[in-house]
């Protein structure tokens, strides 16, 4: 039986190489999944001079209107990756990568980008940033509003000839989600806000800050934690 395919998205001012070190060198997720990495489309100053070129999913100092356009370009960048190397069973996101992965799972967003179904079956988020923290206050909300208006216009045209049956729609994301958060993370509150966008989030905590805690994962408690991450990938919703 083939391993599930997992798309891995890095955080702000980071890159795919760092994510590879997190997922393979620390978490060893390559033991249970075929991992695919993607660099964000925009250059930025790296968070550490030793990691090479930094990349980000939005440009920090842009005005909100411009950020919505760069956000759209980043989402299209991910959709193209899905088209070329997917389909993917799940997605891993760290920090800002967790935010943009979550945003793509919003029905209005992936619908406006031409996807007829949710792009992933499950999502694994590490030290995730909620939308306002990741993209700037109100940027994602305005973007989702524009996507919803576009989707509603297309739906209305279709419904003229084919009235739909009544259906309930939840604003919460329905795919299984596992959230690994640092107890000492400066953005812990934002990570907790991100969990509230999901219908049934599963929560895990480590004792470090805004990082994948390499040393902690060498302990007995850390081994148990990584085993739960791997179990979730193999059977989403049952970690």
What are the roles of these predicted feature ranges?
Residues 3-90, 103:
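Serine-hydrolase catalytic machinery in alpha/beta-hydrolase-like enzymes
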Residues 7-12, 127, 181-182:
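The conserved beta1-alpha1 loop
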Residues 21-24, 187-197:
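Short alpha-helix in the alpha/beta-hydrolase fold that links the catalytic acid
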Residues 40-43, 123-133, 208:
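Active-site nucleophile loop of the alpha/beta-hydrolase fold
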Residues 92-97, 101:
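Gly/Ala-rich beta-loop-alpha elbow adjacent to hydrolase catalytic centers
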Residues 131-132, 182-189, 209-211:
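Acidic catalytic loop of the alpha/beta-hydrolase fold
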Residues 172-173, 177-181:
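Short beta-strand/loop motif that positions the catalytic acidic residue
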Residues 209-221:
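Catalytic histidine-centered segment of alpha/beta-hydrolase-like enzymes
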């Amino acid at each position: 039986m083939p391993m599930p395919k997992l798309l891995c998205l890095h955080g702000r001012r980071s890159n795919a190489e760092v994510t590879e070190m997190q997922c393979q060198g620390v978490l060893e997720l390559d033991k249970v999944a075929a991992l695919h990495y993607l660099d964000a489309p925009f250059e930025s100053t790296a968070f550490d001079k030793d990691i090479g070129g930094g990349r980000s999913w939005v440009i920090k100092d842009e005005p909100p209107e411009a950020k919505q356009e760069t956000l759209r370009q980043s989402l299209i960048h991910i959709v193209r990756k899905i088209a070329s190397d997917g389909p993917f069973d799940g997605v891993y996101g760290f920090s800002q990568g967790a935010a943009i992965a979550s945003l793509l799972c919003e029905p209005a967003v992936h619908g406006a980008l031409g996807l007829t179904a949710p792009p992933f079956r499950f999502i694994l988020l590490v030290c995730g940033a909620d939308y306002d923290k990741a993209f700037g206050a109100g940027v994602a909300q305005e973007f989702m509003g524009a996507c919803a208006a576009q989707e509603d216009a297309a739906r209305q045209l279709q419904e003229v000839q084919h009235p739909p049956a009544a259906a309930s729609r939840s604003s919460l994301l329905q795919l299984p989600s596992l959230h690994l958060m640092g107890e000492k993370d400066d953005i812990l509150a934002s990570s907790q806000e991100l969990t509230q966008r999901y219908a049934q989030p599963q929560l895990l905590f480590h004792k470090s800050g805004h990082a994948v805690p390499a040393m902690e994962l060498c302990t007995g408690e850390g081994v148990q934690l990584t085993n739960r991450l791997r179990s979730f990938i193999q059977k989403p919703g049952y970690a």
